Amino acid sequence: MPVKQQIGIVISNKMQKTIVVKIENRYPHPMYSKTLIKTKKYLAHDELGECNIGDQVLVEECRPLSKRKRWKLIKILSKSSLIN
């Protein structure tokens, strides 16, 4: 089974070694063809704690690391221009 990878935006980094990533999925409505956006939030493992809010990241599915954490950070695609 291939490993699933997704691109998302970091919306929280308040926890130790954990980030919350928002992933948007766009798809057309089957009848009306309007583009709909479905948003999901995933907890991802950030071992070094290098992500900030607003960063665009690549996450990969992995074995369960805790009750809700099943994704890990692969790399930061672009840094946020927000200053913390």
From Swiss-Prot:
Name of encoding gene: rps17
Subunit structure: Part of the 30S ribosomal subunit.
InterPro entries in the record: NA-bd_OB-fold, Ribosomal_uS17, Ribosomal_uS17_bact/chlr, Ribosomal_uS17_CS
Protein name (record): Small ribosomal subunit protein uS17c
Keywords, ordered alphabetically: Chloroplast, Plastid, Ribonucleoprotein, Ribosomal protein, RNA-binding, rRNA-binding
Family: Belongs to the universal ribosomal protein uS17 family.
Keyword rRNA-binding included in the entry's annotation: yes
Any one Pfam family match given in the protein's UniProt record, by short name: Ribosomal_S17
One MF term in the entry's GO annotations: rRNA binding
Annotated compartments: Plastid, Chloroplast
PROSITE patterns: RIBOSOMAL_S17
GO biological process entries: translation
Chief place of localization: plastid
Job of this protein: One of the primary rRNA binding proteins, it binds specifically to the 5'-end of 16S ribosomal RNA.
A single Gene Ontology CC term: ribosome
Domain of life: Eukaryota
